[in-house]
Amino acid sequence: EAYFEVDKQKESFIVKTSFGEVEVLGTSFNVKAYNEEAFITTLERGSVSFTSLTGKKAILKPGSQVVYNSNNFFTRKVDTEIFTSWKDGKLIFRDEPLQNMITRLERWYNVDIKLEDERIKNLKYTGTIEMESFSEVLELIKATTPIEYSFDRKTRVLTISAP
């Protein structure tokens, strides 16, 4: 995942990924291209075009996003701050399932998180997490979500369960 701020220039700025290319002429945008996940480009300001490897093309306007997965893609309006706040040391969640939160926390804190109870994976969370210590973040989530957890510092594995 990378965030770009590109000044206007005569030559195009192109970000190439295994999913396709994002072409820019002066803009701020985020590119999320993890293996086995949908490719997502989120535009804060300016203009970008996305061309998939199969030649499909989308032009984004500020406040929009292209999502590309399995040779299909769509665009949508989004709150860009949710997708770009990581660059400012925060993670923002709006009615986010616990399962999705886990993916973002695993990447940020370089840990493995295991859910012991399938019933809690769809618990919804709304909030902003400033990038504090991992233990402070866990206590915040525990205080606002009905979960229990244990963390093995040696293996860096967090196990989350229902209370």
Task: Please tell me what each predicted stretch does.
Residues 1-163:
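A residue-level detector for the "anchor" residue at the start of short, highly conserved motifs
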